[in-house]
Amino acid sequence: MNQDMLNVFLKRRSIRSYTGEPIPMEKLNMIIMAGLSSASGSAIRPWELIVVRDPQKLIDMSGCRLRGSSRMLAGADAAIIVVANENLSDVWVEDSSIVMANMHLMASALGIGSCWIQGRLREAIDGETTEDYMRRLLQFPSECRLEAILSLGMPDEDLPATPPESLPFGKVHINKY
């Protein structure tokens, strides 16, 4: 593996605090392209991306989780919501997760702060499911299921890269568990 690529993986952190400075559109487009280029089972690509930059909509979205860090959306410059048509693929969760991971890593490589906000199987502050809460705000069709939300902004914190020696190599098993 290329050392530069490994450094991107080690540098990727969940960033929840943003400066308020806008993300340049060319960088946001690169993050989107990273998602669109994701691997997909049988190349079905059951997912759709909803990009939100409207400040009021981001504030409204910040209530999408009862617990967790969705409140950061109120201070984000953008969010990318990944939904997928579950009727198109039985691996829509996996395919959508690959999209999220690619975008999360690209954001890090570009110096953009990002954080994965789990949407599937979660509850919003008003008692709805996170999926129904987001569907009401973003009007995605009923056959589309919510996987996750990627919060994006210029980072207001600089977290250190993960030291390679702290990686859990004990979780690696060769030839048997």
Write out the residue ranges for each language-model feature.
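Acidic, surface-exposed loops and disordered segments
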Residues: M1-Y177
